[in-house]
Regions:
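Acidic, polar-rich low-complexity tracts and alpha-helical solenoid repeat scaffolds
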Residues: 2, 20-338
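Bacterial N-terminal signal peptides
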Residues: 7-17
Length: 338
């Protein structure tokens, strides 16, 4: 213990009594963050005019020196944020991060460009780049923690990226597809209700683009169909799916998917018939015959296209039995009244 204390005292004395020069390659600048400066570098990349500083950033980017490009571009947007050169510098920031594979940071820098410099010449290109980044995340790219550590894929965060694209450029060339992608990300989560809402919004907002609107309406119907398959006794979503597919066939009768939509409607009606049959049996087992009869009749109605189906035949048989029982009970009541 004493020996360790003596050693610590000697080290402390050496540091205090024998100072030495040490290069400081890490320099912190407010607004620019920590920067690495090689020994003797002296900040030779810094310029006193925005235009000259942007030239340094662009030249460095063209030479694939992304560290220098980031420093120089960051300096432009920090010191000269209102200059004519700031938008291009902000664009270079996004391009550097995207090239380095830091897609989330790139997306965020592009978002700053769109919000802070909406008249920038790269507006459409930036939206397209954001869309491509969001698609990469939808396809499984991992989000990073502290900008460095890839940790997990996230459909929630991916949907947020697409929503930002739609909000920023609602009528841009990539906005319709971005709105559809929101629905796809929700489907990947198994969140079919939100997926259907996203598709519905796409169909309503871009009704004047027939291909987009038709795709949105068809996918909305599929989302409701998927949701109906997970709801054992709730037939409302099946009815919604049928309504959407019916609208799809009415609005786009020449679409090649119409025959498939017709098949799906038939499947959904069978599903509705099955669900109503289960409910009818439930009430019949508890001797609620009037309620049971209502649901058996609904099964028959839903099976008009397939009157000889198993569900229809079963419902008809139960209706015959229930009606016979009710007639018998009514007759007994009448006889008792006499």
């Amino acid at each position: 213990m004493i020996r360790r204390l003596v050693c610590l005292c000697l080290v402390f004395a050496g540091v205090v009594l024998f100072p030495f020069r040490s290069p400081a390659p890490l320099i912190y600048t407010p607004g620019e963050g920590w920067q690495y400066e090689p020994v003797g570098g002296g900040g030779n990349w810094q310029r006193q005019r925005a235009k000259d500083q942007l030239i340094v950033a662009q030249d460095a980017f063209d030479k694939k020196d992304y560290s220098l490009a980031l420093k120089a571009a960051r300096r432009v947007v920090h010191i000269w944020p209102l200059s004519d050169f700031a938008p291009q510098a902000q664009f270079i920031l996004g391009r550097c991060y995207e090239t380095k594979g830091w897609d989330e940071k790139a997306f965020n820098e592009y978002q700053v460009l769109l919000e802070k410099y909406p008249k920038a010449v790269h507006y459409d290109e930036v939206l397209k780049r954001q869309y491509e980044i969001a698609v990469r995340f939808m396809n499984g790219e991992w989000f990073r923690v502290w900008d460095y550590i890839p940790l997990y894929p996230s459909m929630d965060k991916t949907a947020d990226l697409f929503e930002k694209i739609v909000k920023t450029g609602a009528f841009s060339s990539v906005a319709p597809q971005s709105q559809l992608k929101i629905g796809e990300t929700r489907e990947k989560q198994g969140n079919y209700a939100d997926a259907a809402k996203a598709y519905e919004l796409a169909a309503d907002r871009y009704f004047d683009r027939p291909q987009i609107a038709a795709d949105a309406l068809y996918k909305e119907g599929l989302a409701y169909k998927q949701q109906a398959a997970t709801a054992e006794y709730d037939q409302n979503t099946a009815a919604q799916a049928i309504t959407v597919f019916t609208d799809f066939m009415t609005l786009y009768p020449d679409d090649t998917r119409v025959p498939e939509a017709q098949k799906i409607i038939a499947e959904l009606r069978r599903e509705q018939a099955r669900g109503n049959l289960e409910i009818a049996r439930y009430y019949e087992r508890r001797n609620h015959v009037e309620a049971a009869r209502i649901y058996y009749n609904e099964v028959v109605t839903l099976s008009l296209a397939e009157p000889n189906s198993t569900y229809a035949e079963t419902a008809k048989a139960h209706l015959t039995d229930i009606n016979a029982r009710l007639r018998k009970e009514n007759a007994q009541k009448e006889n008792g009244a006499k």
